[in-house]
Amino acid sequence: MNKNILRKNRRDNHATKMKTDIVYRLKFGFTRRLNKSLKRGKFVKSKTIPLLDSIGCSFEYFKIYLESKFEDWMSWENYGKYNDELNYGWDIDHIIPSSSALTEDNVIKLNHYTNLQPLCSKVNRDIKKFKNVQYNTKKVYLKRSIIII
């Protein structure tokens, strides 16, 4: 299939989901606000759920928490970078995938700082599909985990 057609379909699907699926909209909004916040050095304001409420700690504590989990090669300068090489850049990874959220409450619980970790961008992209497959085979366990968090 043509790349332009695929892109258009992806955009159309995204727009439809943003209008019709509150859980999708919350997950997307959280990720976008978190990325902007880390680049700006403070939490970005929100009309829905404030990041402070969802993450469960101050911005300063969140940065210290992430830094405590950094590997030797990780720094704020290589946050969000990707070039298909190991140890080039890193992303914020959800330990229990945010894609497992079924309700608004799940979205909030899964975005708590204790469910977030820095992870090599390449590794994060490589295991995303595996996590979703794993989730589909262990729905009951993850539903219980979401309640416990």
Locations of regions flagged by a protein language model:
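Contiguous alpha-helical segments
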Residues: M1-G89
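Generic low-complexity, intrinsically disordered sequence content enriched
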Residues: R10, D21, C120-V123, I146
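Short, solvent-exposed loop/turn segments at secondary-structure junctions
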Residues: S37, P97-S98, N124-D126
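General structural signal for secondary-structure boundaries
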Residues: S58, F62, D105-N106, C120-S121, ...
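Short microdomains enriched in Cys/His and/or Lys/Arg
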Residues: L66, V140-I149
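Histidine-centered nuclease catalytic patch
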Residues: S75-P118
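Short Cys/His-centered divalent metal-binding micro-motifs
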Residues: Y113-R144
